[in-house]
A protein has these predicted regions:
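An N-terminally biased module of ancient metal coordination in phosphate/nucleic-acid-related enzymes
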Residues: 1-39
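Glycine-rich phosphate-binding "P-loop"
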Residues: 9-13, 78-99
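Catalytic pocket-lining loop regions of alpha/beta-barrel enzymes
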Residues: 95-161
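Acidic (Asp/Glu)-rich catalytic clusters
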Residues: 24-41, 60-76, 102-103, 107-114, ...
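The substrate-binding groove and active-site-proximal loops of carbohydrate-active enzymes
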Residues: 8-16, 44-52, 95-97, 118
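Active-site environment of divalent metal-dependent phosphoester hydrolases
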Residues: 5-8, 53-54, 82-85, 126-129, ...
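Acidic-and-aromatic substrate-binding clefts and catalytic sites of carbohydrate-active enzymes
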Residues: 14-18, 50-58, 122-129, 153
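Hydrophobic faces of well-ordered beta-strands that scaffold small-molecule active sites
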Residues: 1-2, 44-48, 74-78, 119-121, ...
Length: 161
């Protein structure tokens, strides 16, 4: 079974295909809460994975995610690290540059903003201009940048600081 983050890029997936991960995370929360031997609670907050390029079609998906998580869904993560140089790879997830500039992506992000959900993603330092565009377009959206904007030190950046 692939993770929700890789399912996003599966051509056979649809906008609802990653909801089982949110459901599973919430079930783990309930299990930990009901386990008297366990002294800690897990998954009090859940960050799921969705492809924001579905745009306006994500409204019922987000609503369902909030429902099945009993409000524990706090944000969405999308792996967007991409570079045009084939020597630079982000691992199992193959994506392309420019996704954050796509009008459908922006529409999907607006749904997050409306529902007070954060947008959490990993990009390379070469994509920070896309992040800036999104931040200026959606000033009330909470954006979480992972891995400090992914400084690249291979390919054309090898040996550069």
């Amino acid at each position: 079974m692939s993770s929700a983050n890789t399912k996003i890029y599966d051509q056979n997936s649809n906008e609802f295909s990653t909801l089982p991960e949110i459901k599973f995370a919430h079930e783990q929360y309930l299990d930990s809460k009901n386990n008297k031997l366990n002294q800690c609670s897990i998954n009090n907050s859940i960050v799921g994975a969705l492809d924001l390029r579905y745009g306006k079609k994500l409204t019922p998906v987000i609503e369902k995610g909030l429902e099945i998580s009993n409000g524990k869904l706090k944000g969405i993560r999308m792996l967007l690290a991409a570079h045009n140089d084939e020597r630079i790879s982000s691992g199992a997830v193959k994506t392309k540059t420019g996704i954050m500039l796509d009008p459908n992506f922006i529409e999907g992000a607006k749904i997050l903003e409306k529902n007070k959900l954060s947008l959490d993603f990993w990009i390379y330092h070469t994509q920070l201009n896309e992040l800036e565009f999104g931040a200026k377009t959606l000033p009330d959206l909470s954006i979480i940048l992972n891995h400090i904007g992914g400084p690249i030190q291979v390919g054309p950046y090898e040996g550069k600081q």
